[in-house]
Swiss-Prot record:
Residues 14-25 have a biased composition (Basic and acidic residues). Keywords: Kelch repeat, Nucleus, Phosphoprotein, Repeat. It holds the Pfam family Kelch_HCF. It comes from Caenorhabditis elegans. This is Host cell factor homolog hcf-1. PANTHER family: HOST CELL FACTOR. Transcriptional coregulator. Involved in control of the cell cycle and in modulating mitotic histone phosphorylation. Plays a role in modulating lifespan by regulating the transcriptional activity of daf-16/Forkhead box protein O, in concert with protein deacetylase sir-2.1/SIRT1, and perhaps acting independently of the Insulin/IGF-1-like signaling (IIS) mediated pathway. Negatively modulates responses to environmental stresses, including oxidative stress, heat stress, and exposure to heavy metals; acting via regulation of the transcription factors daf-16 and skn-1. The gene is hcf-1.
Length: 782
């Protein structure tokens, strides 16, 4: 590892210090990214990376010639893809500038061949992977930015203005005769109006930075502060200066490092990378000068080297923060490199490829093939666990994905002290195969919902639940606990709305129940004749735990996905996962009660009609984050129908046609009397900002199909999680009452309907492309 005064290499142990102490020490940890699937991109240098939500898009650069491929790395799935681009595909280039704004990527400048530079501006629409060459104009008497390489190209997410600073141009504009010229000019272009793009040269005030190339820049915006931070670069010598450009006043300010309060700066460098995480700019790698120079005045390649050192500039405190490596062993950190790419996803920095700087193969530089990530802080607290589907001996749950999490630690407990007193925990330890007797419905359950009609399905169901499509079981169920086995196959579909709203679930439920009372009247009248079920119709309802903090917790597992079908939990024969956590993290390993290596001697099954509590914490290389809020849900009671399956939705002129298969356990639970279909709508509460989604019933009848009119679809809430989708829930009822519901997301990317977007460059609606009206809808199935 390179010596760098800005980085302290120390091996830490999680057990030696608390979370707050680690944060005070600014401990960071490198981890190599392994076990990625998909087509890996070719190693290279001079390429760029931009971030689109959880995707890192890498393109350009080269080694043995320019590379014209584009790859996207999904940080959640750990998967590479190579989208096929269309449109005005640009000529392959290196050392260009690249930014992302909303769902678009922009490329400016770069080198298309040795000595030949460009000033072309391209736009890539990532929803279609379609390139478009843009033709910006200039103000009167103005000029376009000259062709250049090694410049910085950054964008303000607030103003949607992109800034170009510095770079290197060829004065002769002749590829065969290259006369390099370092630049210090500053240009801006407003990308909010793609039909009226204008380049404008800015004349900032104050002494500005000297001309340079191969530097980095980031834009920091918070409240009224908006500034561009320029660091390092090359102008015949490596530079280590740092500058602020106030984007509101266009005034340059140099940050002097002669004040001890600014900390100890890293070594001057060029061809490094910088990313912004929170209020910190992390600087990695690049070419740095050697501490001892050769005696000759002629510069040789031995006078500088590639570094693997890190620097961290705190923008709010205006100081270099000393970082501490969690582990400094040679194989636990990336080797030095330059011309690589870096991207920040959440609180993590990713780096990929770049020039090795130490070895040469024939006339070509050796490029690194590896990807590394840097954990900079413990992961955030996850949102509450949400129920997707309840079975008789299983609970399918999920929670919002935490960016920067390598895995999740899930624990389960009994619902309250009364249920704990009748639980078989102690007996199951000595006789794990012995099934406890089923506890009959208690009077407590009746007291909890005295006004709920008998057998009535709840009119409002939390939309934070898991989303899936459940195909029909090809074989008749032999017991009432059978569930489809192909659920939860894709963690991308588990992302849910903001967990901060989940605290209002109960209040939203009660308020919306009053609004939808008329819609439920038919069900209420029929339900009066039914026997009161033991909360079988309430298995989708999630409740926040306010007490029972002293009840024990049991391990379900350390898993890599934000979803799981819980059927068992570990008994106390197994060592606590908390004690195994360090070793599992160090080896990037997972351990779950569902693993085939564990037998009935190691685990305890869930029982029907039982209320369980859940909590989850996110894990990364630095350890375990805070536990989520506790949530509880209940397994089904025997005798009620299971959830409908094989849901199919097709578009029609009148609206949407839904069909489904009856519950798989009808041979046991008996004849299905009716089905209810619910549509997710926005809850119209007084405080709309904090309101929960509500489910409005749009069908109640005996047939396993229904038509949802366009007038109802017009009131639907379009969920923007991952992909625009409309959410339905379908439940079946027998003589005892309603069983659990199946939730399905009807993807809208084939429909031409208005979809609300969160992209900053589109304040209204975007319209999805219209596909065949009778095509089968694609589902986010788990």
């Amino acid at each position: 590892m390179d010596e760098d005064v800005g980085l302290e290499a120390t091996n830490y142990s999680r057990g030696d210090e608390s979370r707050s102490e680690e944060q005070e020490k600014n401990v960071v940890r490198w981890r190599i990214v392994q076990q990625s699937t998909g087509p890996n991109p070719k190693p290279r240098h001079g390429h760029r990376a931009v971030v689109l939500k959880e995707l890192i898009v890498i393109f350009g650069g080269g080694n043995e010639g320019m590379i014209d491929e584009l790859h996207a790395y999904n940080t959640q799935k750990r998967e590479w893809t190579a989208p096929q681009c269309c449109g005005d595909v640009p000529t392959p280039a290196a050392a260009f500038g690249a930014i992302s704004l909303g769902n678009k990527i922009y490329r400016f400048g770069g080198m298309t061949e040795y000595g030949k530079y460009t000033n072309d501006l391209y736009e890539l629409q990532s929803t279609r992977w379609e390139w478009r060459r843009l033709n910006p104009r200039v103000h009167s008497n103005g000029h376009l930015p000259c062709p250049r390489i090694g410049h910085s190209f950054v964008v303000s997410q607030k103003s949607q203005k992109a800034y170009v600073f510095g770079g290197l141009s060829n004065d002769l504009n002749d590829p065969k005769r290259n006369v390099p010229h370092y630049l210090d000019d500053l240009y801006v272009i407003n990308l909010s109006g793609p039909q009226h793009l204008i380049w404008e040269k800015l004349n900032a005030t104050g002494p500005g930075p000297i001309s340079r190339e191969s530097h980095t820049a980031v834009i920091y915006e918070k409240d009224s502060i908006s500034r561009m931070v320029v660091y390092g670069g090359m102008n015949g010598v490596r530079l280590g200066d740092l500058w602020y450009l106030n984007l509101n006043t266009l005034h340059w300010t140099e940050i002097k490092f002669d004040d001890p309060r600014t900390g100890i700066p890293p070594m001057p460098r060029s061809l490094h990378s910088s990313v912004l995480i929170g209020d910190k700019m992390f600087v990695y790698g690049g070419w740095v000068p050697l501490l001892e120079h050769a005696s000759t005045e002629q510069q040789t390649e031995k006078e500088w080297k590639c570094t693997s050192s890190l620097g961290c500039w705190n923008i709010t405190e205006d100081r270099w923060v000393p970082l501490h490596l969690y582990c400094s062993d040679e194989d636990t950190i990336p080797r030095g490199r330059a011309g690589h790419c870096a991207a920040a996803v959440g609180d993590r920095m990713y780096i990929w490829s770049g020039r090795d700087g130490y070895r040469k193969a024939w006339s070509n530089q050796v490029c690194c093939r590896d990807m590394w990530l840097l954990d900079t802080i413990l992961p955030e607290q996850p949102g509450k666990v949400q129920l997707g589907r309840a079975g008789f001996n299983s609970l399918e749950i999920s929670w919002p994905i935490v960016q920067g999490a390598s895995g999740y630690f899930l624990q389960i407990g009994f619902g309250d002290a009364k249920e704990q007193s009748v639980s078989p925990i102690k007996r199951a330890t000595t006789s794990p195969r012995k099934q406890p007797s089923i506890v009959p419905p208690s009077q407590k359950e009746t007291e909890q919902s005295p006004k709920k009609p008998q057998g009535t399905a709840p009119s409002i169901i939390s939309t934070q639940g898991t989303t899936y499509t459940a195909p029909a079981d090809p074989k008749p169920a032999t017991d009432e606990g059978g569930l489809p086995q192909d659920l939860f196959e894709d963690t991308e579909k588990n992302e849910t709305a903001s967990p901060k709203r989940s605290n209002d679930a109960q209040s939203a439920d009660s308020s919306t129940c009053e609004q939808k009372k008329t819609d439920e009247s038919g069900l209420e009248e029929d339900s009066e004749k039914d026997q009161k079920p033991s909360d079988a119709g309430e298995t989708d309802e999630m409740k926040e735990e306010n007490g029972d903090d002293d009840l024990p917790w049991f391990d379900v597992g350390i898993i890599d996905k934000a979803t799981i079908n819980v059927t068992h939990y570990f008994n106390d024969r197994q060592q606590s996962l908390e004690k195994q956590l360090n070793d599992l993290i160090d080896h990037n390993a997972f351990k779950c009660v569902n693993d085939s290596v564990f037998t009935t001697e190691d685990k305890i099954p869930l029982i029907n009609g039982q209320s369980y509590r859940f909590r989850v914490s996110a894990i990364n290389g630095l350890g375990k984050g805070a536990w989520s809020e506790t949530a509880s849900c209940k397994t089904c009671v025997p005798g009620y129908p299971s959830a409908p399956s094989s849901i199919r939705i097709t578009k029609s002129h009148e609206g949407a046609q839904l069909t489904w298969e009856p519950p798989s356990n009808t041979n046991i639970s008996g004849k299905i009397i009716e089905y209810s279909v619910y549509l997710a709508v926005k809850n119209q509460s007084a405080n709309s900002a904090d309101s929960q989604l509500a489910f409005m019933r749009v069908y109640c009848g005996p047939q396993a199909d229904c038509q949802v009119l366009q007038s109802n679809l017009g009131t639907a809430f379009v969920d923007q999680t991952n992909k625009p989708a409309i959410i339905f829930r379908i439940a079946a009822r027998n003589e005892k009452g309603y069983g659990p519901a199946t939730q399905v997301r009807w993807l809208q990317d084939q429909q031409k309907i208005p979809v609300r977007t969160n992209y900053p460059n589109n304040s209204g609606f975007i319209y999805q492309q219209h596909g065949g009206q009778q095509k089968r809808a694609r589902f986010d199935h788990q």
